[in-house]
A protein has these predicted regions:
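N-terminal export signals
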Residues: 2, 8-26
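Short N-terminal signal/transit or membrane-insertion segments
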Residues: 2-3, 54
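OB-fold and OB-like single-stranded nucleic-acid-recognition modules
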Residues: 25-148
Length: 148
């Protein structure tokens, strides 16, 4: 029986590790402050970070706005807690720092104003929800959330 050198043992160990599949990349953390690069006469301009994360998994924390109903498959995530229903207000009262969150499945929503952390796929571009008529520029799809 031939003795195995330390070097051969280390190389064999590293090669065996290389055969394991790599874990899927973790979701990138996004903040409300990083959503937009600028605001001008042409409207909001998405930040380079947002553009780079299009169709990628993200994690973002914020506050669940008062929902339309107690159980739903979507809600609005805001930077700051809202005491009013965003759907019940005029455009003048509509906050700029919001994301629409579409859950992977309908779920009971937490108390309005509760801080939550959302994980899902970032979607960019104008979209009109066929059921609610809600218009959004940024969405998190196939999402889940937990109380922060």
């Amino acid at each position: 029986m031939m003795p195995i050198s330390r070097r051969d043992l280390i190389v064999a160990g590293l090669l065996s590790l290389a055969t394991f599949p790599l874990k899927a990349s973790a979701a990138d953390v996004l903040t409300f402050d990083a959503l937009y690069e600028s605001f001008g006469v042409l409207g909001l301009k998405f930040s380079p970070q947002v553009l780079a994360l299009k169709d990628h998994p993200i994690v973002i924390s914020g506050y669940m706005a008062p929902p339309l109903r107690a159980e739903s498959d979507f809600f609005v995530l805001t930077k700051n807690p809202l005491s009013i229903c965003p759907f019940c207000q005029s455009d003048a009262d509509w906050p700029l720092d919001i994301l629409v969150v579409y859950l992977a499945e309908a779920s009971p929503l937490v108390t309005a104003g509760a801080k939550v952390t959302v994980t899902g796929m970032l979607e960019i571009g104008s979209y009109i929800d066929p059921d609610s008529g809600f218009v959004s520029q940024l969405r998190v799809r196939n999402a889940s959330y937990r109380k922060a």
